[in-house]
Amino acid sequence: MVCLNAQRIEQLLKLLETDGNDCFLRYGLALEYMKGDQLDAAIEQFNAIFRVDPNYSAAYFACGRALVQQGKVAEAREKFEAGIPVAEKSGDSHLAGQMREALDLLDQ
């Protein structure tokens, strides 16, 4: 399984060489890093997405989850709070709700 993960990461990195601003590829890469517990690398990819497209709402939720896994609760809270209006603006009330639930869990 780790081998497949490494292959996917390698493929995504190669694709990003042709278009480093492709947020969809970066998001996929970040998720692969998360699957492999490479959380710093995942967060780095999410931050690259925010620089290119601050309206990429799914990245806020996933980045917040990665930060929670690292124990960085305050930073995770910031990502969830920032992502809620982005998700709402794009019409994704389900994702906004997921981020609200994540915030509620952080408050417990």
PLM regions and their residue ranges:
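Structural marker of alpha-solenoid helical repeat scaffolds
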Residues: 18, 52, 69, 86-90
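Canonical positions in the second alpha-helix
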Residues: 14-15, 48-49, 83
